[in-house]
Amino acid sequence: MKNLILRIMKYGMRFLYFFMKLFTPVQDKVVFLSRQSDKPSENFRMLAQEFSEYAPHMTSQFYCKLGLKNSMGLGDIAMMLRQMKALAGARVCITESYCVPISILHHKPELKIIQIWHSMVAVKQFGWQTLDMPEGSSSAVANIMQMHEGYDSVVVGSDFMRPFFAEAMRMPLEKILPLGMPVADRILSERNRNHDDLLADFEKTYPHAVGKKRVVYLPTMRRGEAVDCAELVERFPYKEFALIIKLHPLDRDTEIFNTHVIIDTVFSTEQMITLADVVISDYSGAAAEAALLDKPVYFFTPDIVRYAKRCGLNVDPLTVFPHISFAMAEDLINAIGENRATAEDIALVRKYLCGGCDGHSTEKIVELAMQ
């Protein structure tokens, strides 16, 4: 029944879109579509600013609404109708997520669609790579809804990431472009900025961290499962280091009761990476951001076998970054204590995860859009 409803919806949208295209003239505008948030992301805002400078005749419009998986209400339907109307009269569309109207509708030839995704890296698998897996889409729904069809180009963070995105979106490799992300431009531009005020705020909030090296752990959320960090928390050397754990905002399963650990909810992920002396990642894009800031990065993957079966992995840190990746908490702690992450290790993480981020990604994406 669900599949039948989806088919009816798809063909109904196509019928309506035919008339929208017929009566909507193409204008010099770029439309930004997203299901990641109700507000334009920083990537979107930076691109809109660049469009205003590079192509001042182009106007920017945002159509953003947080879309939950397997959920659609009246607000979602209303937003899709607005997105359809916008697409019917646009010259350029930038998206950072899978958006139904982009993939299932037949667009005017004047419209160029660029997918920048919401993460410059894809350490874990997604899209067509994870069909019928616990955290993936069903193959029936993916085919009916033509998941990730309709893009002219997909922008990623590095050349190494290209084949993974090509597989996840079922696109030719030549359409996957390692131009980097706009937000990386800003991170690189602020790399040498003074952060004394931010540090003062942190030490005022967490006075017991003063005088200690700050180790920031940024675990990926496991849907319906707690982060496996009990051994790390128990064995961690708190006299020398402050362990700050920044859980995913949607993580409701991980509980940590050790009073020595800082479970931060005050500062942003980027602020914590900026303040970190050491960053611990697992399967998220946090490692890329840390590498852009030349931070020592380690990968902690105690549940890698289970996680790979549940979510799928494009990048196995134990294989790709063996010198700085650990499945055992004791080995990770020893490596941090020995400052084992070298400049070469950080450079390798940066090359593989965000090698296309050279500080000029925003302008390159806009140039691509205007070609």
Enumerate the predicted regions with their spans.
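Membrane-proximal basic amphipathic "stem/tether" segments
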Residues: 1-37
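A short, charged/proline- and glycine-enriched loop
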Residues: 22-31, 110, 210-213, 240
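Active-site and donor-binding regions of nucleotide-sugar-utilizing enzymes
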Residues: 31-191, 196
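Conserved catalytic-core segment of nucleotide-activated headgroup transferases in glycan assembly
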Residues: 40-50, 168, 176-255, 326, ...
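Short active-site oxyanion
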Residues: 59, 91, 149-154, 242-243, ...
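A donor-sugar binding/catalytic signature common to diverse glycosyltransferases
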Residues: 93-107, 112-117, 122, 266-311
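Nucleotide-activated donor-binding/catalytic signature segment of Leloir-type glycosyltransferases, i.e.
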Residues: 251-267
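Catalytic binding pocket for nucleotide-activated donors in carbohydrate/polymer assembly enzymes
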Residues: 285-354
